[in-house]
Amino acid sequence: SKSQKKLEEYNKVVSRFSKKSLDYIQARYDPKFRTDSLAVDSIEKLSNQNVVREYIYSLNFVMNNPDSYVAPYVALRNVENTNVKFLDSIYRKLTPEVAESKYGVALKKYMEDEKSAE
């Protein structure tokens, strides 16, 4: 289905970020870098940048696919720590059909719960 293809497209890109994160973890614990604090700091910086890039990719994916049932799923799964106001912007951008879907409703409930917890 169209949604399955969108999810596969998203997962393909995210898996590259995950692989890169694993590479950084492996490099961080490589014996030849363990005693080199400059190298360790550089690896940590690259690792943090990779996390930010994945997060930004996820946000962009959601914002650029408001007509996909995958968008609210990705928002709940990967950008749940986003500011509630931004999640609200994401939700309002969804098409009515997507907003009324299982994950659209779950996203709305999550936002409402977060707002009431503030």
Where are these regions (language model features)?
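Short helix-to-loop capping/linker segments positioned immediately adjacent to catalytic or ligand/cofactor-binding
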Residues: 29-31, 58-63
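Short amphipathic alpha-helical coiled-coil/interface segments
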Residues: 40-58, 91, 111
